[in-house]
């Protein structure tokens, strides 16, 4: 692992058999050359500014689910303590989280507090550089960042003690701002391997290709895609809307408990955004949650959040309902800046 860590820090892999990796692809590209066998390692190199996916060492793929809650606008310091959820066990609990860029030691997160319960939808908004995307990357264990303080508990487990792939298999999923292409690997093969990796983790029976196909057809309906989509290579030649729907399809197949959607609305026209939002809403249950990172109010018109959090200078400074986003849209960040 050490030999490929530097170049694969923005990567995920899924493999039935893991061959030796002698020379990882360069960072600037989003394409990766693979062998013709879908059971080979799938090394998907992401651009440096993409959201980090958990690094999956063998037959693993990231799983998603997100959430949190509160009712009216409050200061972030009282967020954890003031919630009226006595007796409820949080899905995700973040306390005083601090993190730096591993290489430069620049501090980005400066005491983030957030509590997410099952069945909630949370949105994190903020200016560029506020720390919101870094927060999502730290949650999934991106190696470019180092946690220097605080705690993250997911489903009662200390997330900071878990490797990125273990976080993924535990039920944490993260979507990409710019989903990568995987030439030579069909969606069907990709999803089947990811699904069975999750099943193995849960100690459940795996599905053969015929059984999996039957399972997958209903998931395609959720994301408004036809069955011939399964024969296409992962994200290759896809439109922006198709790539985002493919991300949601992965979420639907994997059944994660917490989904982190990092700017899933970026680059989408209104029709594509509505399709993606409809798919996300169709996956919400009382047992899973969603954490959305976004710049824009328009996403919140289609996916209604339980709570909205405003980040500034590495901290959540305000939490409230949808009226907070409308105030932001009308008056800008100056109206709520700490």
UniProtKB/Swiss-Prot annotation:
Tissue: Present in all organs, with higher levels in aerial parts.
UniProt entry keywords in alphabetical sequence: ATP-binding, Chloroplast, Nucleotide-binding, Plastid, Transit peptide, Transport
This protein's record includes keyword Plastid: yes
InterPro entries to which the protein is assigned, alphabetical: AAA+_ATPase, ABC_transporter-like_ATP-bd, ABC_transporter-like_CS, FeS-cluster_ATPase_SufC, P-loop_NTPase
Principal location: plastid
GO molecular function: ATP binding; ATP hydrolysis activity; ATPase-coupled transmembrane transporter activity
Stretch forming the transit peptide: 1-66
Assembly mode: Interacts with NAP6.
Name of the protein described by the UniProt record: ABC transporter I family member 6, chloroplastic
Lineage of the species this protein comes from: Eukaryota, Viridiplantae, Streptophyta, Embryophyta, Tracheophyta
